[in-house]
Amino acid sequence: AASRAFARGLFHVQGLASQFAALCVGAQPGQKVADLCAAPGGKSLTLAECMQNQGKLISGEYVESRVPLLRKAFARCGVTCAEAVQNDAAQLRSDWGKFDRILCDVPCSGLGVIAKKPDIRYKDLDGIENLLLSQQKILQNGADLLAENGRLVYSTCTVNRDENEEQVKTFLENNPRFHVAVPALQLPGMQQGEYGTLFLPHKTATDGFFAAILETESTQ
C-alpha cells in the first residue's frame, strides 16, 4: 500500500482464488453488473477492469461502515462505472431492475482463510443454520435479479460442503432452469465437481475457496 504505483491505482492486491471468482462472472464492457457482497472491493475492481470501465456496476455492502472502503478503492483506481451502496443482499431489490452478470460472494464461515485469520479456528458453528439461510436468500435474490441469458456466480471462502456444493444443489432443485457451467479458466490443482469448483490450499497453494457458475439453459 506504500507503493506509488498502488497509490496511483495501477494495481490492486487480490488472492488468486478470489480473482478466479470475479473472472468467472465474465463481465463485459457495457453490461449491467452487480456485486452483491462487495466490501472491501477487490472483486468489484476486477469486475470493473473486465468491463473496461464501461457500463454499470452496482457494488452493494451490508455493513454501512465498509461502504467507504469501496468508494475509496474506486477513486484510487479511477473506476467511474461503479456505484457503492449500502444494501442487504438477503432482501430483494426489485427497483434495481435486471442485471447481465451477478456475483454473490456470500458471507461464510471463512474456513478457507484460517491461515490468514487463525482466530477462526476457535469459533464454533452454532450459528451455521442462520448463515446457511442467509446464503440461500442471497443466492435466490441474485437469480431473481438476473436478466435472461445472464450469468450468476456463487462463491465463498470456505471448504464447508454445506455452504458450497449443498447450497448449489438446493438452488438447482428449486431453480431447474439453471445449470452449473464449467469455467473457461483452469488453474492447477482446482477440483471441478458437479456443483462447482473447489480450491483446497494444499492442492492449489491458494486460500480455500469455492465458486459455481450458474447459467440458464438458454445462456450463450
Q: What label would you give each PLM region?
A:
Residues 1-220:
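S-adenosylmethionine
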